[in-house]
Amino acid sequence: MPISLVGSEMCIRDSNITPVINNILEAYKFIEIFRKTHSAALQLNTGMNRLGLNKQALFGNLDIITSLPLNLILSHLACADDISNKENITQKDLFIELCKTFPKMRKSIAASHGTLLGNEFHFDMVRPGIGLYGGIKNSELLNIIQIKVPVLQHFIIDKNMQVGYNFTYKAKHRMTVATLSMGYADGLPRILSNKGKLFYGKIPCPIIGRISMYLVTVDISHLPGIPEYLCMFSPDYQVDDFAKDCKTISHEV
């Protein structure tokens, strides 16, 4: 989680953190407290307009900026998840222009999606986050995340029997139901009630009824036996697929 340098001085000092300077106030504060003990990174705003110094702020304060003991110049791409978006090149070109002020400094503009845009976006350092765990859709990346959900109980229900809070699911036939130890308090979104799935290997097992705080009920009638656990993901259903079913993005998941 990003923190402001101003107000976090003790944390930076005690944990020997290299702060990222995003504005002139932080630059002055860094020089006042850490100039002799720490190095810093400088973030440039190349178009996302979220954090960092824009072109005017940079060139209007070169005296203070060039006096900083910097070890990295960085920026962040707004549209890196869209390979065809021309804004990626626009930001990269502006980044290169601004970095001419720091010719020998290490540079970084690519986070996870940015690493897939090509070598010209890699510079001296890339900053993969979610990409380390396979959370972005790319056939060349291995997905290493798995969550195993224990089966607590299983039972058989007959046709027209109902399941879960407010009986939002009615059985259309005799079926075997498993109750598993995971609910919305554990991060399984309620939006998946009656339409999500867990997995036995590659076999999907539909979620039936409402997902409750710590429990979820699943149809396992089609499985060869009673499993000890089911999985959140499968080789054909990864974090990005799960996120789409939750109507969100893999970073939030």
How should each PLM-predicted stretch be described?
Residues C11, A41-Q43, L72, T179, ...:
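Conserved beta-strand segments that form the floor/walls of ligand-binding pockets within enzyme
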Residues S15-P19, R106:
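Short active-site oxyanion
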Residues N16, S39, M125, Q146-K148, ...:
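Broad gene-expression machinery/nucleic-acid interaction feature
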Residues M1-G7, C11-I12:
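Single conserved hydrophobic/aromatic residue that forms the stacking wall/gate
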Residues L25-S39, L44-K159:
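Active-site loop/helix belt of alpha/beta enzymes
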Residues I24-L25, K247:
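Alpha-helix N-cap/helix-start capping motif
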Residues D14-S15, H76:
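Structured helix-beta-strand junction loops
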Residues I156-V253:
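C-terminal accessory subdomain/extension
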